[in-house]
Amino acid sequence: MKNFEQVLKALQTGEVIAYPTEGVFGVGCDPDNPEAIQKLLELKQRPVEKGLILIAASYEQLLPYIDESQLTQEQLDQVHATWPGPYTWIMPASDKVSHWVSGQFDSIAVRVTDHPLVQKMCNAFGKPLTSTSANLTGQPPCMTTEEVEEQLGDRLVAILRGETSGRNKPSEIRDAKTSQILRQG
């Protein structure tokens, strides 16, 4: 567990980390730390306007970031029926969410993961992580620790060693208000 503690410490001190998810490796940081998010965006060569996903161990961890008042109970039930799992939902963002996370949108992309290592990290950290695929923009997402080290290693502080859950593709993204699939999973 030495690696886990090392990665948690990096996360707590505002660094960008890499970690296995259901389908591909992700990179992320503290969603409430603008400097950490800037590092992440620079690492990925990703424009801030695109926004980032928040990945959490539980729905409760996401509540401070979501404006539930804009969703019906039926819409919320539809979201909850897919979690935990590889489904990302676009939901109305709360006032707490900075533009560093939401990008150009007034919504936020959120997921409750069923990956045990990510659940453990989010629980130890006490809140969600930002999440985007571990790759440079335009490159294929990394599937293994070795691929992360090859593509991003010299730019990352810590990689949480482990395996993806074997889905071999990024999570499906849906809109909670319309149920529209925005990215096939």
Swiss-Prot record:
Domain of life per record: Bacteria
EC number(s) on file: 2.7.7.87
Amino acid composition bias (Basic and acidic residues), ranges on this chain: 164-177
Pfam families attached to this UniProt entry: Sua5_yciO_yrdC (PF01300)
One GO cellular component, as annotated: cytoplasm
Keywords associated with the record: ATP-binding, Cytoplasm, Nucleotide-binding, Nucleotidyltransferase, Transferase, tRNA processing
Molecular function GO terms recorded: ATP binding; double-stranded RNA binding; L-threonylcarbamoyladenylate synthase; tRNA binding
Domain (YrdC-like) ranges: 1-185
A Gene Ontology biological process term: tRNA threonylcarbamoyladenosine modification
Reaction(s) catalysed (UniProt annotation): L-threonine + hydrogencarbonate + ATP = L-threonylcarbamoyladenylate + diphosphate + H2O
Protein task: Required for the formation of a threonylcarbamoyl group on adenosine at position 37 (t(6)A37) in tRNAs that read codons beginning with adenine. Catalyzes the conversion of L-threonine, HCO(3)(-)/CO(2) and ATP to give threonylcarbamoyl-AMP (TC-AMP) as the acyladenylate intermediate, with the release of diphosphate.
Family, as annotated: Belongs to the SUA5 family. TsaC subfamily.
UniProt protein name: Threonylcarbamoyl-AMP synthase
Organism: Vibrio campbellii (strain ATCC BAA-1116)
UniProt lineage: Bacteria, Pseudomonadati, Pseudomonadota, Gammaproteobacteria, Vibrionales
Gene coding for it: tsaC
